C-alpha cells in the first residue's frame, strides 16, 4: 500500500500537537513544565488535540462540537453525574493554536490495572442516558453520523482499492443510499420508527469510553454528543451487551432498546466504521483496527436488515 503517513511524519505531527497544546496553555496562563503524551490516536486527554479529522469536517463545525462537549460535561458534573470535567483553570471554550483545535480538561489518574468490563459499562450507560434526558443544550439530530463525511469517504475509498475492494465500496454505497435519508432527516426517521423518543445521547459508544479512574469510573469523551435514539450508543455491541443495557434501563426507569432501531443503528455504525478507512493514509493503524469490522460486515444482511 502507498500514500500512508510515515513514522517520521506521524512523530512530527505528534510533536507539533504537543507544541501547540503547550503554547495554548501558556497563553491561557497555565504553567507548563513537563508535557506528556497520554494517548496518541484521535484525541489525547487533558489537552485534547484532534489531529485527524473526517474529510467534510469544517473548523466551524469542529468548534461547535468541542463547545458542546465542554458544555455537557460541565452540566453533568454540576448535576452530580460522574464525568471528567473541563479544566477550571482556563475559560470553558475551545482554542486554536498553530492550526490545531484544543480543549482543556481536568487530569484524572487512570487505574491502569483495571480490565474493562463492557457488560458493566453497558449497564451503566443507561444511567448516563437517564441523566442526559434533561440536558437543556440545543442539539442537532444525529449530527454525529456526519453524513457529508461518510459520503465523501465513500468517494475517496472508490479510488483506493488497497483499502476497500470495489465490490465492498459498491455494497457500502447501496447501503448508504437506503440509510442516508433516515440519518439526514428527523422527519424521515420518525416516520420509519414511530413512537421512538429522541434525546441527547453520548454519540460515541459510551461503554467503550468509560474512564476507569483510581477514584472511580467516569463518563468521558462527549465530542460526538447528538440528539438521537438511545440505540445509537449501543450500535454494533451485540446481544450480550445490549441485554446488560436493558437491565440498567429497567433500573433507571427508561425504555429498553428497540430491535428495529438497533438494526438501523448497527447498520449505520458499521458503515461509519468501514468508511473510517479513508483516514488510514493519515492514521495507518486504522487498517489493523478496522479490517476485522469489514470482514464481519461482509457476513451481515444488506443494510443490517433495515427496510424502508
Q: Language-model segments: what does each one mean?
A:
Residues 51-54, 99-115, 155-166, 271-287:
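A glycine-centered beta->alpha junction motif in the catalytic cores
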Residues 2-9, 152-164, 275-308:
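ATP/Mg2+ or Mg2+-diphosphate-binding catalytic cores
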Residues 204, 208-210:
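Catalytic-loop signature of eukaryotic-like protein kinases
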Residues 11-18, 51-98, 114-123, 127:
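A conserved alpha-helical element in kinase catalytic cores
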Residues 200, 211-263:
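Active-site Asp-x-Gly
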Residues 27-45:
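ATP-binding glycine-rich phosphate-binding loop
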Residues 1-32:
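Juxta-kinase regulatory segment immediately upstream of eukaryotic protein kinase catalytic domains
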Residues 112-174, 198, 308:
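A cross-family kinase active-site recognition segment
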